[in-house]
Amino acid sequence: MFGNDIFTRVKRSENKKMAEIAQFLHENDLSVDTTVEVFITVTRDEKLIACGGIAGNIIKCVAISESVRGEGLALTLATELINLAYERHSTHLFIYTKTEYEALFRQCGFSTLTSVPGVMVLMENSATRLKRYAESLKKFRHPGNKIGCIVMNANPFTNGHRYLIQQAAAQCDWLHLFLVKEDSSRFPYEDRLDLVLKGTADIPRLTVHRGSEYIISRATFPCYFIKEQSVINHCYTEIDLKIFRQYLAPALGVTHRFVGTEPFCRVTAQYNQDMRYWLETPTISAPPIELVEIERLRYQEMPISASRVRQLLAKNDLTAIAPLVPAVTLHYLQNLLEHSRQDAAARQKTPA
């Protein structure tokens, strides 16, 4: 009955329509994902019967009214979402969705990367892209019995990050560092990467890798179809580490993964515990990886953290920040504050 169906694109700024979408998602046991930039809705006889959204290169919030399931509408909606993403210059697409929608997106050319059985699947619109990416990593492979890996945000890069890298590199024949690639953090990705490259230039046997979509960002991980936070965290950990262990680690020959101890964030502390299971469990058909926790570097009896640096930056307290970060980071933060002051002064001078 597609002839009477109306497909509409809805921006986040359209409050009335967004309220209708939120209600429809709620009726389908979903919620609005805050990262979605634009939705496509399907209405029939002025009633909302389906919707889906685009967040960057990720398809999210797909819901089909139970009354119209089986009509083929889902396939049409998925095609419209893919076309919209392409128009927005996103051609490398992912979807995190309920297990029940896996077959639907297979019909649209998506392939399953990994899954949390019975809960969710992660798919992309290629059957070979992840394998090609893993293959491309092999040129960075180095010989040795102990090959380490660190994954970090460095938001911003601190003396604590540098200490972890130094300690891990000293224990390994080679160390690989991946920087999580997302710009929803306080500092742009390219800035964070530049600080890490400059701040580790003197550390031997280290390769700093640009992040990729296959190093999963917690910031972009969807939670709109999972109600319990503990289940969200579990799914994130399982998805992230299955991809790492099955594809990325074998390409580089990684035998050990290093993390800092986590005294502050309960979620990260639990992630470290769960990481040990997913890196070592024999249920995954990939070589096990040993998790190594390194005690966090302290300053005046307190572990150094990026969150503490961000708190101090909000207070413009560069004096307190100075002993917590490398010189390259301090210089960057000084420039950041100076530009903020100049922008504020310029706004004050601009007539209303």
Curated annotation (Swiss-Prot):
It catalyses: holo-[citrate lyase ACP] + acetate + ATP = acetyl-[citrate lyase ACP] + AMP + diphosphate. GO terms for biological process: biosynthetic process. It comes from Escherichia coli (strain K12). Keywords: ATP-binding, Ligase, Nucleotide-binding. GO terms for molecular function: [citrate (pro-3S)-lyase] ligase activity; acyltransferase activity, transferring groups other than amino-acyl groups; ATP binding. CDD domains: Citrate_lyase_ligase (cd02169). This is [Citrate [pro-3S]-lyase] ligase. Acetylation of prosthetic group (2-(5''-phosphoribosyl)-3'-dephosphocoenzyme-A) of the gamma subunit of citrate lyase. Residues 1-128 form the N-acetyltransferase domain. Its EC number is 6.2.1.22. Coiled coil: none annotated. Induction: Repressed by H-NS. Part of the citCDEFXG operon. It is an enzyme of class 6 (ligase). PROSITE patterns: GNAT (PS51186). It comes from the Bacteria. The keyword ATP-binding applies. It holds the Pfam family Citrate_ly_lig. The lineage of its organism: Bacteria, Pseudomonadati, Pseudomonadota, Gammaproteobacteria, Enterobacterales.
